[in-house]
Each structure stands twice: as structure tokens, then as C-alpha cells.
From Swiss-Prot:
Keywords: Activator, Calmodulin-binding, Cytoplasm, Differentiation, DNA-binding, Nucleus, Repressor, Sexual differentiation, Transcription, Transcription regulation. InterPro entries: HMG_box_dom, HMG_box_dom_sf, SRY, SRY-related_HMG-box_TF-like. Transcriptional regulator that controls a genetic switch in male development. It is necessary and sufficient for initiating male sex determination by directing the development of supporting cell precursors (pre-Sertoli cells) as Sertoli rather than granulosa cells. Involved in different aspects of gene regulation including promoter activation or repression. Binds to the DNA consensus sequence 5'-[AT]AACAA[AT]-3'. SRY HMG box recognizes DNA by partial intercalation in the minor groove and promotes DNA bending. Also involved in pre-mRNA splicing. Residues 54-122 bind DNA. This is Sex-determining region Y protein. GO terms for molecular function: calmodulin binding; DNA-binding transcription activator activity, RNA polymerase II-specific; RNA polymerase II cis-regulatory region sequence-specific DNA binding. One of its GO terms (biological process) is male sex determination. It comes from Przewalskium albirostris. Belongs to the SRY family. SMART domains: HMG. It is found in: Nucleus speckle; Cytoplasm; Nucleus. GO terms for cellular component: cytoplasm; nuclear speck; nucleus. Gene3D superfamilies: High mobility group box domain.
């Protein structure tokens, strides 16, 4: 079966000589596929998306605006469709009832034809599909907004601002340096005062111990009174 269908190896004449029945099946298979491809290309037996959709009958304004829209578009080729629609609505409101009457009559005639052609017609408006938006968590969304604002609105320095910023930075730097120097000075003074105080205490104790025999030679009541605390 696979040898029969392989056209690259065997020609149609060889296939017919080897197995005429298989050639008939293969040819019918090729013709069926070709007809199916033709149907796909021409759109036969394929249900189109708008095949079942029936248009609404035109009202008086649409009947009037069809021809008027073409004229306005030809007169103003650069005008957008939305602007043309606004102009047509304004012009339609300015028309009198006598001027609108022929278009209402034409709309009634088209409505009667539409009822005869589609007796069970009911207007069914198409529903608009709602797009699902994936929302980020609150914290991450706020962070993204902040990052977006920072990237879109960078801070630009001007000459005056740069000078002011530089002077502020220099003043802050000098202030921090002065505070550091003052702190180091107080620390050194505090350390030196404690060192001097300790040294004075040692000197005083040494001097008292050296002079102790002299105080003992004095009267006992004076020596005791001197060393009472």
C-alpha cells in the first residue's frame, strides 16, 4: 500500500501496470483531496461567521446619510469618519419635517420588505467581550508605579540648582567635619582629664605615704583628726 502511494519512486503508468485497483483508489483519493481543497478555497460548505447575522432595516437617518456621507467624504477627503458623522447629525437636525418625509417613507418600505424576507426576525445586539485585566498586588503595583514615575520623570539639574545643591553639600560636609573635630577634641580632653586626675590621685597618695611619719610625730589627737574623713 505504501509503495503504491509513493509517487516519488513509481510513476502512474508503473502503478497501473502493477495494481490497477490500487491506481483507481489512489486516483480517487487524489481527486477527492483536490475537490476538498477547492471547497476550502472557494468557501463552499463552510459556515461563515457572519452567515446567520441579519442586518437591521435602515431607518430614515441612515437612508439619508448614505448619499450625504459620500458627498461629504468626496468634498473633504482628509476629514475623519467621526467628524463626518458629527456633521451629518448636525445637518439632519436642521432639516424640516417636509424634507425628512421622503426618507421616512423609504424607511417604512424597507421595513416591510425586511419583514417579508425575515418574518421571525428579532434584533439581538452583539455582546461586547470584556477584557480580563490581570491586576498586580497592592504593594508591587505601587512599587511599579513609583519606578515608572522615577524613570519617566528624572530630576534635571540646572545651573542655579546645581550651585545651590553644591553649596548645601559643602556646608553639610563642613558642618559634619566640624562636629567630628569637636567630638574628637572633647574625647581627647575627657581622656586627658581622667588621666590627669588618676595621675594626681597617685601623686597625692604617694606624697601622703611619704609624709606619714611626719604626721605621726605630731600629737595623737591632731594626727587622728587629720586622717578622719
Amino acid at each position: 500500500m505504501f509503495r503504491v502511494l509513493n509517487d516519488d519512486v513509481y510513476s502512474p503508468a508503473e502503478i497501473q501496470q502493477q495494481n490497477p485497483l490500487a491506481f483507481g483508489k489512489a486516483s480517487s483519493l487524489f481527486t477527492d483531496n483536490r475537490s476538498a481543497n477547492d471547497q476550502c478555497e472557494t468557501g463552499e460548505n463552510v459556515r461563515e461567521s457572519g452567515q446567520d447575522h441579519v442586518k437591521r432595516p435602515m431607518n430614515a437617518f441612515i437612508v439619508w446619510s448614505r448619499e450625504r456621507r459620500r458627498k461629504v467624504a468626496l468634498e473633504n477627503p482628509k476629514m475623519q469618519n467621526s467628524e463626518i458623522s458629527k456633521q451629518l447629525g448636525y445637518e439632519w437636525k436642521r432639516l424640516t419635517d417636509a424634507e425628512k418625509r421622503p426618507f421616512f417613507e423609504e424607511a417604512q418600505r424597507l421595513l416591510a420588505v425586511h419583514r417579508d424576507k425575515y418574518p421571525g426576525y428579532k434584533y439581538r445586539p452583539r455582546r461586547k467581550r470584556k477584557r480580563q485585566q490581570k491586576l498586580l498586588p497592592a504593594d508591587s503595583s505601587k512599587l511599579c508605579k513609583q519606578m515608572h514615575i522615577e524613570t519617566l520623570q528624572p530630576f534635571t539639574y540646572r545651573d542655579g540648582c546645581a550651585n545651590t545643591t553644591g553649596s548645601r553639600m559643602e556646608s553639610q560636609l563642613s558642618l559634619s567635619q566640624s562636629v567630628t573635630i569637636t567630638n574628637s577634641f572633647f574625647q581627647n580632653e575627657h581622656h586627658s582629664s581622667w588621666t590627669n586626675l588618676g595621675h594626681n590621685r597617685v601623686t597625692l597618695a604617694t606624697q601622703i605615704s611619704a609624709d606619714f611619719p611626719f604626721y605621726q610625730s605630731l600629737q595623737p589627737e591632731l594626727s587622728c583628726a587629720y586622717f578622719q574623713y
